[in-house]
UniProtKB/Swiss-Prot annotation:
PROSITE patterns: THIOREDOXIN_1, THIOREDOXIN_2. The keyword Nucleus does not apply. The lineage of its organism: Eukaryota, Viridiplantae, Streptophyta, Embryophyta, Tracheophyta. This is Thioredoxin Y1, chloroplastic. It is found in: Plastid, Chloroplast stroma. Residues 63-169 form the Thioredoxin domain. The record marks 87 as: Deprotonates C-terminal active site Cys. Expressed in roots and seeds. GO terms for biological process: positive regulation of catalytic activity. Disulfide bonds join 93-96. InterPro entries: Thioredoxin, Thioredoxin-like_sf, Thioredoxin_CS, Thioredoxin_domain. Pfam families: Thioredoxin. Keywords: Chloroplast, Disulfide bond, Electron transport, Plastid, Redox-active center, Transit peptide, Transport. The keyword Transport applies. It comes from Arabidopsis thaliana.
Length: 172
């Protein structure tokens, strides 16, 4: 059994006649309160947790991205020779981070058919507001500069590819 001791100086209500309605004598005679409760141990059995040395640590694979500059987002959409899949994300969004390797796979699989662009909604709130981005991640597929499909939430690579192909009526 474990116990916790609280002195009357730790718990202000034990010193205060107004808060407890206890007389001054009773309040002075209460010097400590003990709470007892069972403490359970967590058994790990034969589980072993190896320590990681600097040689065994995993480092994330670097993905090369083409950083392009355009006068405006609309220029990018209108001047693209392929449909553009725009991923609206935020760095603090867990599902958005989950989608990073999936988008890389989709981009590689459909590289001849679409261009993938990521827009950080924290850095570009005007673009997010224009397209009424209220959930993250949100994907909008643009064809000829106009939105042709929109979907929200995390998807598998297979689901995302199928959705894009259905929207564009293209097959790999």
């Amino acid at each position: 059994m474990a116990s916790i001791s609280l002195s009357s100086s730790t718990v202000p209500s034990l010193n205060s006649k107004e808060s407890s309605g206890v007389s001054a004598f009773a309040s002075r005679s209460i010097s400590a309160v003990k709470f007892q409760f069972p403490v359970r141990r967590v058994r790990t059995g034969d589980l072993k947790f190896p320590s990681l040395s600097s040689t065994t640590r995993c480092t994330p694979r670097r993905i090369e991205a083409k950083k392009q500059t355009f006068d405006s987002f609309e220029d990018l959409l209108v001047n693209s020779d392929k449909p553009v899949l725009v991923d609206y994300y935020a760095t603090w969004c867990g599902p958005c981070q989950f989608m990073v390797p999936i988008l890389n796979e989709v981009s590689e699989t459909l590289k001849d058919k679409i261009q993938v662009v990521k827009i950080d909604t924290e850095k570009y709130p005007s673009i997010a507001n224009k397209y009424k981005i209220e959930a993250l991640p949100t994907f909008i597929l643009f064809k000829d500069g106009e939105p042709c499909d929109r979907f929200e939430g995390a998807l598998t690579a297979k689901q995302l590819i199928q959705r894009i192909e259905d929207s564009l009526k293209v097959k790999p």
